Amino acid sequence: MEKGREIPGIVVAPQLAKGSWNPDKLLELIEYLQLNYCVDAKRIYICGMSLGAYGTLHFAGKYPNKLTAAVAICGGGNVKDSCNLSTIPLWLQHGDLDKLVPIKESQKMYDAIKKCEPNADVTFTTIKGANHSQVERLFHEDAMYDWLFSQVKQPVLYDHTKE
């Protein structure tokens, strides 16, 4: 956005002053936006880096039905959320030289999601030669946005013939 990229939607960027992310507060924010703005429920995305990536996976793990897709950069999460995370398109990205949040944190989540659901739509990208701060550039590249905006939540259809 800062570099002139037009985002086809509403961008909300909550900041965390201290403590940890509260997925319930984020849900309240999303529901407020849906009530007060024209929000396409088939296109709700979340992404974050570092502590924001932990918050992304925490929220997506608790409320996967509220999202279309998620991107977590240089973060990690709770493997107990892996089965819920396996239900949405997810892109994990991590620098292989990250000393602040070791790459094993993203790898652990990827492995747990694939263990829960081998066909899960989860991608793990290692950014070669990048430390924690160097992966911030991903927010300035088209690949992440192109991938996110290509994701559209499909309606869940009820099959009454299986009663």
Predicted regions and their residues:
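Short, proline-enriched alpha-helix->beta-strand connector loops that line the catalytic pocket
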Residues: 6-9, 85-90
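C-terminal catalytic histidine-bearing segment of alpha/beta-hydrolase fold enzymes
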Residues: 89, 93, 97-163
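Short acidic capping loops at alpha-helix termini that bridge into adjacent secondary structure
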Residues: 40-43, 68-69, 120-121
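Active-site nucleophile loop of the alpha/beta-hydrolase fold
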Residues: 16, 71-79
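Short beta-strand immediately N-terminal to the catalytic nucleophile in serine-hydrolase-like folds
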Residues: 46-48, 73, 93
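Gly/Ser-rich "nucleophile elbow"/oxyanion-hole loop immediately N-terminal to the catalytic nucleophile
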Residues: 19-50, 62-64
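Short glycine-enriched nucleophile-adjacent loop
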Residues: 53-64, 70
